[in-house]
Amino acid sequence: MAINHIDWAIKAENDWKVVKLIIANNYDPEDILCYHCHQVAEKYLKAYLHYKSLQQIPIHDLLKLLDKILSIEPGFSILRSKLKILNLYGVRPKYPDDYFAPLKSDCEEAIGASKAVRKVCRKFMKLDKKKLK
């Protein structure tokens, strides 16, 4: 089975569900909340690459994914500052060797950034009014 943009968008939505669950749990655990905010953005950017039939790049760096997208869609440039925020949470929260405890304000910033990325990606893929399973 060939993977397409909808498959990636569904995975991103699953991460978004986790974000909402952690918000409902009073932002606990904060590090995992921020990690899943990054995952929402990463998977939606990869969904867009699939949507445009661009070669997938196996990286977690959101700014590098953005640069690839900008080669065909300059409208994504509005996300650069949001992706810069989220890039802080792609790898670091996953490992115990560098204790990482974001503040509630960091969480709120990450949530806002991932929400913006989600909205833009869904709009460009014409998924903004579509419910994904």
What is each stretch, according to the model?
Residues 1-133:
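Terminal alpha-helical segments
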